[in-house]
Amino acid sequence: RDCLLSRGLGDVYKRQDFMQAKIVVREMAEQLAMDLVEKKLVTDQIVLTVGYDIDNLKIPEIADHYHGEITVDRYGRSVPKHAHGTGNLDAMTASVSRITETTMGLYERIVDPMLLTRRITLVANHLKDADSVKEEPFYEQLDLFSGGFLQTGQKETSRETKQLEKERLEKEKHLQEAMLSVKSKYGKNAILKAADLQEGATTIDRNRQIGGHKA
């Protein structure tokens, strides 16, 4: 059964620069992927929206060099227009590596590194039940430059690459499921990465929240 829904994470954070917000976006991408695995869902599209801080245009070092679009918020205050973009995955997936890679590429592409951020929203679109998605068959690729199909050696290399990637994703899925099992039993902070302990990281605090609010 196709879910045809979206699922996402979003919050308002303290004012952050480009690199600080980048840490948060990576955490959100990893958490979104874990949420999809937990719900047995897959996606093929990621949407990222980053809202900029109201004080950007009050800081001379930023305002004097910003030449992008300016909007007015509901309070009548001028603020740089938010960044918004879509990243498409090459297949339906809940892979943390693929979702994170797509999200970070999107962040680098759409966010102005000069501006301070305030609000971040990350959404997975086109959700489907993981069990309803069948593996895509392997097709020989037509090489227009040589005027024919790929040679046997090239086809074998493509097949081997595809098989290796399939095995890698399967191992990653099992690891994600194992992590979810441990967190379910011992708490969300039972497993942390070194990146979760660096300055600006929010995973630990977010894991302590209930219904989106700090307990």
How does the language model describe each region?
Residues 1, 7-215:
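Basic, low-complexity intrinsically disordered segments
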